[in-house]
Amino acid sequence: MKLHELRAAEGANKASKRVGRGTGSGLGKTSGRGQNGQNSRSGGGVRPGFEGGQMPLYRRLPKRGFKNIFAKEYAAINLDRLNCFEDGTVVTPELLVEKRVVKKVKDGVKILGNGNIEKKLTVKAAKFSKSAIEKIEAAGGKVEVI
């Protein structure tokens, strides 16, 4: 086989559909768009959500609520996720991101009390649940609010 003998695989190169080139082609006159009207025109059709003049669904339904721009969003972590650290480690939000325990520290980290902790850790975070504080201190660790 030589370079000039190479051919594309069967069906790899599909010829473009040539429309509006005579009735004998089967796609002449209306070019496969049916009879004339809004949808047969270039750029024709209605905008998304338009229901033919009827009040559209997105306007029939009431608006509700608002976005509180002062809301704090904390990255929540349960205690059992902290067992991946060695005894005596100082666990900070930066370390949690580095070890991929949490993807992103938003407005801080909140430690929740689900699961058990077997390691003696010093945990620094923005918020703690009451049960998390009890369990960390029961394991011999320390809690620091930053």
Curated annotation (Swiss-Prot):
Superkingdom in the source lineage: Bacteria
Gene3D superfamilies for this protein: 3.100.10.10
Ranges of Gly residues composition bias in the record: 21-35, 42-52
Example of a GO cellular component annotation carried by this entry: cytosolic large ribosomal subunit
Protein's UniProt keywords contain Ribosomal protein: yes
GO BP terms in the entry: translation
UniProt keyword annotations, A-Z: Ribonucleoprotein, Ribosomal protein, RNA-binding, rRNA-binding
NCBIfam families noted in UniProt: rplO_bact (TIGR01071)
Chain's role: Binds to the 23S rRNA.
Subunit text: Part of the 50S ribosomal subunit.
Protein name: Large ribosomal subunit protein uL15
UniProt source species: Clostridium botulinum (strain Okra / Type B1)
